């Protein structure tokens, strides 16, 4: 039975009385965001919008993105990645379970030195998928676009991890699962965090 989103008390500056707000809104105010479902247009737009707002509010404060996601749309993942690297606020990414497919791309997109995984996290990279059907010309056109995006994603993984483009391309040919330690050795994350204070 779903319990819904819990409510917590929060007092805005200047207010004497705390208001009950949902947990996510409370954490957004502390600059904590979540990528904890399939990454689709709606979630990507929410994350991008909140990051832009928080950056405009105070560029000197960091933003924290907690990730537990099987991935999702390639274009959405690239959009979130670009927004994270566009804003001036440092973005710390933290894998708290699974960061697979485009979620691992977002994880790798955090500020260098501020990409973390909890000790028992699983990270997975693979090549983007296309699902076109219909006329041959449409299928061919989409296949070419998927290959172009695959090359772009592989290049970014290579830049973010320090791995050669050849190795990234080879590893993306199949689902490449990694433990937190393996992801650190690979360069997808910088630290394995065992407590919040890290």
From Swiss-Prot:
Keywords: Chloroplast, Hydrolase, Plastid, Protease, Serine protease
Transmembrane regions: none
Any one Gene Ontology cellular component term annotated for this protein: chloroplast stroma
Enzyme class: hydrolase
Highest taxon, organism lineage: Eukaryota
SUPFAM superfamilies documented for this protein: ClpP/crotonase (SSF52096)
GO biological process: protein quality control for misfolded or incompletely synthesized proteins
GO molecular function, one term: serine-type endopeptidase activity
Compartment annotation: Plastid, Chloroplast stroma
Active-site residues, as the UniProt record annotates them: 101 (nucleophile), 126
EC number annotated for this UniProt entry: 3.4.21.92
InterPro entries in the record: ClpP, ClpP/crotonase-like_dom_sf, ClpP/TepA, ClpP_His_AS, ClpP_Ser_AS
CDD domains (UniProt xref): S14_ClpP_2 (cd07017)
Subunit structure: Component of the chloroplastic Clp protease core complex.
Family designation: Belongs to the peptidase S14 family.
The protein's role, per its UniProt record: Cleaves peptides in various proteins in a process that requires ATP hydrolysis. Has a chymotrypsin-like activity. Plays a major role in the degradation of misfolded proteins.
Protein name, UniProt field: ATP-dependent Clp protease proteolytic subunit
């Amino acid at each position: 039975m779903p319990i819904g989103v819990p409510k917590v008390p929060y007092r805005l500056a200047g207010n004497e009385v705390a208001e009950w707000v949902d947990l996510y809104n409370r954490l957004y105010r502390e600059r904590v965001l979540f990528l904890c479902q399939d990454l689709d247009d709606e979630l990507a737009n929410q994350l991008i919008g909140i990051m832009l707002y928080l950056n405009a509010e105070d560029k000197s404060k960091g933003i924290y993105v907690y990730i537990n996601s099987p991935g999702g749309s390639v274009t959405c993942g690239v959009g979130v990645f670009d927004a994270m690297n566009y804003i001036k606020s440092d973005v710390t990414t933290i894998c708290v379970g699974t960061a697979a497919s485009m979620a691992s791309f977002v994880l790798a997109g955090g500020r260098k030195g501020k990409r973390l995984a909890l000790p028992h996290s699983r990270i997975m990279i693979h090549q983007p998928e296309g699902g076109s059907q219909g006329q041959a010309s449409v299928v061919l056109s989409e296949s070419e676009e998927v290959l172009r995006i695959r090359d772009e994603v592989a290049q970014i993984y290579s830049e973010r991890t320090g791995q050669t483009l050849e190795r990234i391309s080879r590893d993306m040919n199949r689902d490449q699962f990694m433990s937190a330690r393996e992801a650190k050795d690979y360069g997808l994350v910088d630290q394995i965090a065992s407590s919040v204070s890290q």
